[in-house]
Regions:
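Membrane interface segments of multi-pass transport proteins and intramembrane proteases
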Residues: 305-306
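Membrane-embedded alpha-helical bundles that constitute the cytochrome b-like, heme-associated redox core
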Residues: 2-302, 311-369
Length: 369
């Protein structure tokens, strides 16, 4: 009786019409190990598995940022006397320029929102416990870099709101001990926000931050692939779904939905240009930074000018910085998670941080004055 043998493989690819090409590619770009790894990779399956998708959403939106940012650079001029006019040109005369600009702005905000959700979901699932401490550290750094992207990009249109909001943000750095004044002068390139400031922010936004972000992102993704995704404390070990095709299919569907939402927001709620910045004009009433910084500016309003002989604003900045540092170092002080236990102190601290961020942000919009 004749027996059928399994088709031979070339570099992990099925034998067939393109076997020769597959073998040629495998000898020059070995991918069989990667393919074999993906075939056996699993994602933990539990009631919070959907939260893993927010990391992929942030990655997708970062890609959108890169593409739309490059397109905007073709027409944008980083000079105080031409920046606003170049934005008007993009929005009014460049074909689909208004759409590209809206997509860039909306995707930036959605990306930071996705990162916040991703960070807190990892926190409450205690997914930072050993050996995944560096995944948490690199992820936290990515959030900080994303917020820095937002801060540097906000000034580039050179509008009234962006000018005075940036002024508030850079003035805050003066309260940092020792290096504060020097940091402010370095950012501004002058005594006040002017042309050199715009040039420096543009360089930071398009030349300095992108390679740093890409390196940290690469490390973050590499660590996730090497160590895998963490099982929640108390979850059933060994219960998972194949990464390919099950999780990839789910993630692809979510990406399509996110791109659809991004398109709807960009078309029906296009990003406004605003009024041109006038350094000699008074600051408009109710000025505030981007939404992901409003918690900081709003909380400083409730601190008295002097507290125990210290500048109230400086004390507020120190308190926010200390809270951020505690949050950043949670994998190293949460000994309960290392023992596979949850503790109310860690959960309570995370809940307080969320309530603080949400409350201060809402107050900034509901009571701007």
């Amino acid at each position: 009786m004749a027996t059928t043998s399994e088709p031979k493989r070339a570099g992990g690819f099925p034998e067939g019409r393109f076997a020769g090409l597959a073998a040629w590619l495998e000898s020059r770009m070995p991918l069989s190990g990667v393919l074999e790894f993906l075939r056996h990779k699993e994602v933990p399956w539990h009631k919070g598995t959907f939260l893993y998708l927010f990391g992929g959403i942030a990655l997708l939106l970062f890609g959108v940022q890169v593409v739309t940012g490059i397109l905007l650079m073709f027409y944008y001029v980083p000079a105080a006397d031409q920046a606003y006019e170049s934005i008007l040109l993009i929005s009014a005369q460049v074909p689909f320029g208004w759409l590209i600009r809206s997509i860039h702005s909306w995707s930036a905000n959605l990306m930071i929102l996705a990162l916040f959700i991703h960070l807190f979901s990892v926190y409450f699932m205690r997914a930072y416990r050993p050996p995944r401490e560096l995944i948490w550290v690199s992820g936290f750094i990515l959030l900080v870099l994303s917020m820095t992207f937002g801060f540097s990009g906000y000034l580039l249109p050179w509008t009234k709101l962006s000018y005075f909001a940036t002024k508030i943000g850079t003035d805050v750095t003066k309260v940092i001990p020792v290096v504060g004044e020097g940091m402010r002068n370095f950012l501004l390139g002058a005594n006040e926000i002017s042309g050199p400031t715009l040039t420096r922010f543009f360089a930071l936004h398009v030349a300095i931050l992108p390679p740093i972000f890409t390196i940290v992102l690469g490390l973050h993704l590499l660590l996730i692939q090497l160590l895998g995704m963490s099982q929640p404390i108390g979850g059933a070990k060994g219960k998972g779904i194949p990464f390919v095709p099950n999780f990839v299919l789910r993630e692809s569907i979510v990406w399509v939905i996110v791109l659809g939402l991004l398109a709807v927001l960009s078309v029906y709620l296009p990003w406004e240009v605003g009024e041109k910045a006038d350094p000699l004009a008074p600051a408009p009433a109710g000025i505030r930074p981007e939404w992901f910084f409003t918690f900081m500016s709003q909380s400083l309003k409730y601190i008295p000018p002097k507290v125990l002989g210290m500048e109230g604003e400086a004390l507020g900045i120190y308190a926010i910085g200390a809270g951020g540092l505690i949050f950043f170092l949670v994998p190293f002080w949460d000994g309960w998670a290392r023992q596979g236990k949850r503790h109310w102190l860690v959960t309570g601290f995370g809940a307080v941080v969320i309530v603080f961020l949400v409350t201060m942000t809402l107050l900034a919009y509901l009571k701007p004055y």
